[in-house]
Amino acid sequence: MDMYQKRKIRAEKKNNNQEEKLTKVGINWYPGHMAKTKREISEKLDLIDVVFEVIDARIPYSSKNKDIDKMIKNKKRVLIMTKIDMCDIINTNKWIKYYEEKGIKVIPVDLINKKNISEIFKVTEEVNKELNDKRKEKGLKERKVRILILGIPNVGKSTLINTLVGKKATNVGNRPGITRHLEWIRINKDIELLDTPGILWPKLDDDTIAHNLAAMTAIKEEILDTEDIAIYIINTMLKLYKDSIVNRYNLTSYNDVVEVLDMIGKKIGAVRNNETDYEKVYSIILRDLREGYLGKVTFDRL
């Protein structure tokens, strides 16, 4: 990269000014199956006893689909916060308190180590008792509790279901859009769960939310440029978790994001003939954030 190119990048991607406004993205990513899913959910809502809304503890605001509030109407709802093992618990706890003050029950879970899963079953037992006590009063037979599981793509819905079932019931992968249709799954003799594809709102016109979703793989990487995502991650880490990123890549003095990228390139062996392989650097930054090598983080702040 010659000096002209570096100056151009510096002009476009200054990271010294943390208040710099992000490029307006106005992302339109609303595949046909998402609109279809919303219609099908509305059709089946009367069958549902409780809604499990799944969000990512690292982005507890950005990963919450605001359209779900309208979709589920007055149904009983539990907010299940996954990836609690990867978040900055001090700041995520503020979000837990925020949602609980709005009257929403929150259950933070670690799906890797299966922590707090019993709390989910405790809730379903309470719903089961309430449901079937009422049915008995009306002279009706007992029936299974029916749960609707909702959330944006790639927040851990499939992993959660497999954990509840105790075996592999759904496909799991670290990319959005794996589940493509509604499917009833039997959890045990008392619980049935309706799994749904991840659904976003029609237009992501909030820059910070869009970048948070892209950073944590809730939207496909093709939607936002990897350079843009990587630079957003660097700027956010330098602002919120400076020690973590400095220690990870042995960063010393730097004047702008290009110098940070060059230092990271040297650290990971992505420099050849004095030229940094920026695509490799971007890829490593995204990987390090998503796999926890940059430490425990929460990008949404109250």
Task: Enumerate the language-model features and the residues they cover.
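Helix-rich effector regions associated with P-loop NTPase G domains
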Residues: M1-V50, R58-I59, K64-K66, K73-K76, ...
